[in-house]
């Protein structure tokens, strides 16, 4: 996962979108300038009319646009907010600074869902569904996004049959996720899962302290953990080598 692709959430009409196409997974999404629509919000208009000290950068825009995959022609639709920002330059011929404004925008909704990392195909369906739900929230609500990631860990514990309740005095008491992770059978990723859980906890508390980089780093940890569980390259390489050595030649194919 290239974290630099996802820490950037502010774009212009000339930006390059290094996102994977939802359909073919290639990085071939291209911004369609003729499909880009902006409209000043009514609140922004009212503020502009009532304030003499108003400046153009204070405009708030609702935006909509499309990206099209050059490889498979899938179209991705997005909505968001934006505002004009000055990108002036010094003109040597005029010997003066020339003011130019460009619309910067941030998507708050993207459809079809962009996957921030590739989920292994052998990952349990319920875990996959919860992670995809978090991808949808990444653009608009980081706290809810983090909470979805945390829920995916709860489901992962269920899939691995990690004890969910303790019984005492005839009562069934839920076991905290932290303690369930400590009992997770794949000890090599326990610390990874605990780190993911802590960020998920922050989202659950609605503290508004989370930043985009926090979620992106958490996705990096989650990607690593899932690959170790369901797409262990090292284990596959060792398996291939073992089969070749046992046959003293090429592996048997189906």
Predicted feature descriptions by range:
Residues 3-6, 17, 23-58:
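Short recognition patches in nucleic-acid-associated and regulatory proteins
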Residues 14-20, 62-65:
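Short metal-coordination and nucleic-acid-contact micro-motifs, chiefly zinc-binding Cys/His arrays
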Residues 22-25, 67-70:
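Cys/His/Pro-rich metal-binding microdomains
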Residues 68-126:
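Helix-loop junctions and short alpha-helical segments
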Residues 109, 158-194, 198:
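Short, charged amphipathic alpha-helical segments flanked by flexible coils
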Residues 124-142:
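A long, hydrophobic alpha-helical segment
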Residues 142-164, 203:
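Hydrophobic alpha-helical packing segments in soluble, helical-rich domains
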Residues 191-246:
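Charge-enriched, short contiguous segments at helix-coil
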């Amino acid at each position: 996962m290239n974290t630099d692709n996802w820490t950037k959430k502010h774009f212009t009409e000339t930006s390059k979108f290094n996102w994977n196409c939802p359909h073919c997974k290639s990085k071939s999404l291209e911004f369609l300038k003729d499909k880009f629509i902006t409209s000043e919000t009514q609140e922004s208009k009212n503020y502009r009319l009532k304030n003499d000290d108003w400046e153009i950068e204070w405009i708030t825009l609702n935006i909509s646009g499309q990206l099209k995959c050059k490889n498979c022609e899938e179209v991705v639709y997005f909505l968001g907010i934006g505002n004009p920002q000055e990108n002036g330059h010094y003109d040597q011929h005029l010997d003066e600074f020339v003011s130019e404004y460009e619309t910067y925008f941030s998507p708050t909704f993207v459809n079809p869902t962009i996957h921030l990392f590739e989920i292994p195909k052998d990952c349990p369906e319920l875990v996959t569904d919860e992670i995809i739900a978090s991808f949808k929230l990444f653009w608009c609500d980081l706290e809810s996004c983090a909470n979805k990631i945390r829920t995916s860990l709860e489901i992962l514990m269920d899939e691995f049959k990690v004890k969910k309740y303790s019984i005492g005095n005839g009562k069934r008491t839920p076991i905290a996720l932290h303690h369930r992770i400590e009992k997770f059978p794949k000890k090599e990723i326990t610390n990874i899962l605990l780190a993911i859980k802590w960020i998920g906890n922050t989202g659950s508390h609605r503290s508004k302290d989370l930043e985009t980089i926090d979620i992106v780093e958490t996705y990096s940890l989650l990607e690593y953990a899932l690959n170790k569980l369901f797409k262990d390259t090292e284990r596959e390489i060792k398996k291939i080598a073992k089969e070749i050595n046992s046959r003293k030649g090429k592996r048997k194919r189906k």
